[in-house]
């Protein structure tokens, strides 16, 4: 069920809405005991949007939105996962639905004579009853209130609701033409701040992650036969914890890339892309850099160049590595994933066109 109101006058538009949400979660546990895990959640979700146009090239939009997130059936299941005796996990049947408020503003401006554009976005999300983790580490053999037996050094983790989650973002981009290169140049700046609450041995831990990034993109507009893009993106992150300062960490991540597409005589098509990634500040074995280079060559065939046959080679340098970092309220995890490596592919494509 929802209702709304809209007001429009010349350069301004206001829209307000109110929605009633009813969510039904169904689940049934059969082992070790039979248990109905079904839950129902209901909430009222207001929203407001204001748009104002200064002129044909400048406008601003303001948003207020609300949304919810239900716990999963696994989160609600009071069953201990003891597949790892030193790291036990369980659900929590008392979990509530989280409720978030989001404020957002967007501003855009364009100058058609100069060919420039500017865009800025600011958003903040605050969440009540945020679903987070509570972790207890036993200093000695311990029996918890719920009867769970923990060996010395063992951990018990379960989801809980906590207030105080906050996520703020700022994004700006500015674009301008470079006529001498028949290209366009875009600069972008990002800022992020995330506050994630959690519990460690009954104490509140607040993990604060602050990030600042800068990027630029040079893209061509030469012709249909020559197309290239150069880009760079670098981000620096600062992670601080109130209860676990040993998890505090600063790290840097950057990607520089280039892409080139050419249509040569005799309808030969050459494509290549190259990227260089750098990680600094991660765990010792993860601080590394690598380059990824792909290339392909093919030929357009059939009438109107509808078909193309070619050969593609991926990871020519054999350096591809998948690395990621996850920052949570209770731990920081660096992950390296095995990838396929160098390989090639023969491909064929055909473009079906409607005569109408």
What are these regions (language model features)?
Residues 9-11, 20-26, 64-70, 79-80, ...:
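Transmembrane beta-strands of outer-membrane beta-barrel pores
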Residues 1-51, 56-102, 124-152, 183-193, 216-219, 223-238, 316-330, ...:
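Surface-exposed extracellular loop regions of Gram-negative outer-membrane beta-barrel proteins
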Residues 96, 115, 119-223:
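Outer membrane beta-barrel strand-and-loop segments of large Gram-negative receptors
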Residues 11-14, 57-60, 113-117, 179-186, ...:
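Repeated loop/turn-to-beta-strand initiation elements of outer-membrane beta-barrel proteins
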Residues 278, 287, 299-356:
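C-terminal beta-signal and adjacent terminal beta-strands/loops
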Residues 1-9, 20, 48-52, 105-109, ...:
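Residues on the lipid-exposed face of transmembrane beta-strands in outer-membrane beta-barrel proteins
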């Amino acid at each position: 069920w929802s209702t709304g109101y809209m007001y429009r006058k010349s350069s301004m538009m206001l829209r307000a809405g109110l929605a009633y949400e009813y969510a039904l979660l169904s689940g049934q546990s059969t082992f070790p005991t039979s248990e109905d895990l079904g839950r129902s959640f209901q909430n009222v979700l207001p929203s407001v949007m204001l748009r104002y146009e200064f002129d044909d090239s400048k406008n601003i939009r303001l948003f207020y939105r609300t949304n919810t997130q239900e716990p999963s059936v696994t989160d609600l299941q009071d069953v201990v996962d003891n597949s790892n005796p030193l790291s036990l996990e369980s659900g929590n049947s008392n979990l509530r639905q989280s409720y978030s408020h989001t404020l957002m503003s967007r501003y855009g401006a364009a100058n058609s004579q100069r060919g420039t554009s500017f865009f800025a976005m600011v958003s903040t999300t605050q969440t009540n009853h945020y679903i987070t983790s509570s972790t207890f580490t036993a200093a000695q053999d311990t029996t918890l209130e719920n009867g769970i037996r923990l060996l010395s050094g063992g951990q018990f983790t379960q989801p809980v609701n906590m207030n105080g989650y906050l996520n703020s973002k700022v994004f700006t981009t500015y674009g301008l033409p470079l006529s001498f290169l028949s290209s366009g140049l875009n600069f972008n700046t990002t800022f992020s701040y995330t506050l994630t609450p959690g519990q460690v041995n009954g104490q509140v831990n607040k993990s604060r992650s602050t990030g600042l990034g800068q990027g630029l993109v040079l893209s061509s507009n030469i012709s249909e036969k020559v197309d290239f893009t150069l880009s760079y993106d670098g981000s620096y992150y600062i992670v601080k914890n109130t209860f676990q300062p040993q998890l505090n960490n600063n790290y840097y991540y950057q990607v520089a890339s280039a892409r080139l597409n050419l249509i040569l005589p005799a309808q030969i098509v050459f494509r290549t892309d190259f990227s260089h990634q750098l990680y600094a500040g991660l765990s010792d074995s993860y601080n590394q850099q690598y380059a990824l280079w792909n290339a392909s060559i093919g030929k357009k065939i059939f009438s109107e160049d509808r078909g193309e046959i070619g050969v593609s080679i991926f990871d020519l340098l054999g350096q591809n590595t998948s690395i990621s970092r996850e920052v949570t309220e209770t731990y920081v995890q660096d992950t390296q994933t095995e990838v396929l490596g160098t390989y090639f592919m023969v491909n064929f494509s055909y473009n079906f066109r409607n005569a109408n």
